[in-house]
Curated annotation (Swiss-Prot):
The lineage of its organism: Bacteria, Bacillati, Actinomycetota, Actinomycetes, Mycobacteriales. The keyword Ribonucleoprotein does not apply. This is 5-formyltetrahydrofolate cyclo-ligase. ATP binds at residues 6-10, 139-146, 177. It catalyses: (6S)-5-formyl-5,6,7,8-tetrahydrofolate + ATP = (6R)-5,10-methenyltetrahydrofolate + ADP + phosphate. Pathway: One-carbon metabolism; tetrahydrofolate interconversion. Involved in the removal of 5-formyltetrahydrofolate. In vitro, it is a potent inhibitor of various folate-dependent enzymes in the C1 metabolism network and in vivo it might function as a folate storage. 5-formyltetrahydrofolate is also used as an antifolate rescue agent in cancer chemotherapy. Catalyzes the irreversible ATP-dependent transformation of 5-formyltetrahydrofolate (5-CHO-THF) to form 5,10-methenyltetrahydrofolate (5,10-CH=THF). The reverse reaction is catalyzed by the serine hydroxymethyltransferase GlyA (SHMT). Belongs to the 5-formyltetrahydrofolate cyclo-ligase family. Transmembrane segments: none annotated.
């Protein structure tokens, strides 16, 4: 793939995602959930996310993490008074308690934990529009995860969750981009990067 601007790539990937039929997305979400048993997470902390729109994943995936014995933390996204994204805060996932939030997201109710709490996670599932084989991740562009992931433990598995066709050969990267260690796709499962 020849490098394109991040903006052009985001637009193309979002258009492609929106064209995927709901039944296909549901099947892919179920496949993603099936790969979780390969993670050794009982008694450990997993930072995950609540998918919105056409993002890969599901609430059932979060429930499976709990069933596997993990402490599951979900992000809380906020901007400062000037509209600049702040590092993500974290809230404990409890089934049936998610509330509507800014940016069309769903999140756990307070109390919330500080951004540095991500450092307790052994596994971090990160939403992405795409990831490449070197671990470069393309998000939606707000920078919430880039402002937060530098708090992750060096030993954490940082896993971008994408559709199979969103694992690319190359993505334009910038110095502030935090590399993923793994990718999770419906067909490939969990694959080490870099």
């Amino acid at each position: 793939m020849s490098p394109r601007s991040k903006s052009q790539l985001r637009t193309a990937l979002l258009q492609n995602r929106r064209s995927v039929p709901e039944a296909v997305r549901e099947g892919e979400a179920e496949a993603l959930r099936g790969w979780l048993s390969g993670l050794k997470i009982s008694g450990r902390t997993v930072c995950a996310y609540v998918p919105v729109g056409s993002e890969p994943g599901s609430i059932a995936l979060l429930d499976t993490l709990l069933e596997l014995g993990a402490r599951v933390l979900l992000p809380v996204a906020r901007n400062d008074a000037a509209g600049i994204p702040l590092p993500l805060q974290w809230g404990k996932y409890r089934p049936g308690t998610l509330v509507a939030a800014e940016f069309g997201l769903r999140e756990p109710p307070p109390p919330w934990l500080p951004a540095e709490t991500i450092g307790e996670a052994d596994v971090i599932l990160v939403p992405a529009l795409a990831v490449d084989r070197s671990g470069a991740r393309l998000g939606r562009g707000a920078g919430f995860y880039d402002r937060t992931l530098h708090h992750a433990a060096a030993t954490a598995q940082v896993i971008a969750v994408v559709r199979d066709d969103e694992l690319l050969d190359e993505i334009p990267a910038e110095p502030h981009d935090v590399a993923m260690t793994h990718v999770l796709t419906p067909k490939r499962g969990i694959v080490a990067l870099r």
